[in-house]
Amino acid sequence: MSKPGKPFILNSPFAPSGDQPSAIKKLTEGLQDGLAHQTLLGVTGSGKTFTIANVIAQLNRPAMLLAPNKTLAAQLYAEMKAFFPENAVEYFVSYYDYYQPEAYVPASDTFIEKDASINEQIEQMRLSATKSFLERRDTIVVASVSAIYGLGDVNAYMQMMLHLQVGAIINQRDILARLAELQYTRNDQAFQRSTFRVRGEVIDIFPAESDEIALRIELFDDEIDNLSLFDPLTGHSFGKIPRYTIYPKTHYVTPRERILTAIDQIKNELTGRQDYFIKEHKLLEEQRITQRTQFDIEMINELGYCSGIENYSRYLSGRQEGEPPPTLFDYMPADGLLIIDESHVTVPQIGGMYRGDRARKETLVQYGFRLPSALDNRPLKFEEFERLSPQTIYVSATPGNYELEKSNGDIIDQVVRPTGLLDPIIEVRPVASQVDDVLSEIQQRVALDERVLITTLTKKMAEDLTDYLDEHGVRVRYLHSDIDTVERVEIIHDLRIGMFDVLVGINLLREGLDMPEVALVAILDADKEGFLRSESSLIQTIGRAARNLNGKAILYADRITHSMQKAITETERRREKQQKYNQEHNIIPQALNKKVRELLDIGQTDKQKKGKQAVKIAEQSASYTPNAPKSRQALEKELKQLTQQMQKLAKDLEFEKAAAVRDKIGQLKMALLEV
């Protein structure tokens, strides 16, 4: 398949500065010299993403960015999208909103059926990501660790594509039959993703990987007379095109010949398994495996797929036992780049995925719920991941031993920030008075309209501290592990816009999310050596205050542990280097005024997005801005108007919009107190 050689066009009003130019130069030269592994030690707020964007643009090679979770992947995706608006920036994370894998608990003889809720928007983005890798050189895919999980075989996927060209001889029935093979469904009433409709000699197709473009095929007898793209909502035509390729609805489609071969192989394995269970006098297990597998075979034969078809992926992709599954890496061009963000977290995650998955499946196989071949439906083993990985850049403020070893200890330092901001000042204070001391510090910060993060060791302490601060009039929220990804981003968004001032957490305030408004990080019980108070954890947590001009970290401890000493020494090293650079170049540190980006519409339905847009319109109509000086009379008048607007929206059952107006009222009341 020919791929257009469109270059990456980096869109940024800023030129690289601070340590960025030397980091870009070293990384680019290293990749050109064929280095397989490089490590970028980039401190918080040093513009690591911008450095990577420059490297990609200079080398003009497709890239995959791996992030440790969906939240950071969404943030990276938003940033890369802004840097490369003219190129293909894609998003590839797990498409499950909810996922309960099938499992068997022998102790209670409980079988748990697979139960999942698939997010259609993210499924579309995943299909778009693989399409871009197959079609375009100017592609950046931002992925989570989902990238190491099994995906449909790339060769079978490409074999199933439907290529259409103006002037091609093909009759309507053949096109419809091919669409059915691609698992598209006919729906002449509701035109949505992965469906087609037929009107006379016109076929409209809504591609599975698209969210805003549909294809119209106009036939004349058995010849394609016209191909055109149009807006599926309005019907507005985007113009005629000479050719178009329809991609399958799912990555798991398989040609008919391969399906028939796979069915024979599944039957052979089933026979062997039946003999084994009968020989072992396990008649219940023999009955289970026979019943389940025969039902699946029937479904695959009739429809081309069945529930849990991924458990037969070894046969459907034509692999041998123990071979690595096809993954996103198989769709990636051979000269692609791999960038692992927050590598000190992401790399160990990749290593742990295979073992957890294997333990669950072995139980299913042992008790007759799955054939042994189901064990090959798995994520990549760590050594397979290493073997498949192209040239790799590890990015972290605290690289782990693995990254240092792979890079032969040669680290590219990006410590100096373009803004001239310094690493936070660190103070160590006694544990005995930590709660009262934190309260006093909070009051000082709130008076300056700054935010505070507090990290504790236990859930109980976090809850008690939150209650205590709340009783003392502090606007505080508690971020715990039960909060889902979307709500977590919303809480951090609310902290940034000033809906509350203090966020308390345990292990959720470390990597990644930009919060320039946070001026103080308080680490309680910093001298309790362990996972949450390790050197890298402390450096990452301290780094949350590094984007603020007045950044400060207070470590409450009665003794200086080995981890604390190393974290303090490293922070002081960075601070010294930053100060020296600022003096040499006459740089005055500047506050980082980073826009509060909306990450939350990734993976939301059109209906949810429209609701959010309507909320934004409601916000714009309220002329109140927190920093605009207004008289008390004007504020009271506006408060009255907004209250009426909120009541009307609530009466009309427009609760999302009403909640947005309610938040405005809260800000307005705070402004009134200050007048």
Curated annotation (Swiss-Prot):
Subcellular localization(s) per the UniProt record: Cytoplasm
Annotated transmembrane regions: none
Pfam families per record: Helicase_C, ResIII, UVR, UvrB, UvrB_inter
Residue stretches making up the Helicase C-terminal domain: 434-600
InterPro entries, per database record: Helicase/UvrB_N (IPR006935), Helicase_ATP-bd (IPR014001), Helicase_C-like (IPR001650), P-loop_NTPase (IPR027417), UVR_dom (IPR001943), UVR_dom_sf (IPR036876), UvrB (IPR004807), UvrB_inter (IPR041471)
SUPFAM superfamilies given in the database record: C-terminal UvrC-binding domain of UvrB, P-loop containing nucleoside triphosphate hydrolases
Function: The UvrABC repair system catalyzes the recognition and processing of DNA lesions. A damage recognition complex composed of 2 UvrA and 2 UvrB subunits scans DNA for abnormalities. Upon binding of the UvrA(2)B(2) complex to a putative damaged site, the DNA wraps around one UvrB monomer. DNA wrap is dependent on ATP binding by UvrB and probably causes local melting of the DNA helix, facilitating insertion of UvrB beta-hairpin between the DNA strands. Then UvrB probes one DNA strand for the presence of a lesion.
NCBIfam families listed in its UniProt record: PRK05298.1, uvrb
The protein, known as: UvrABC system protein B
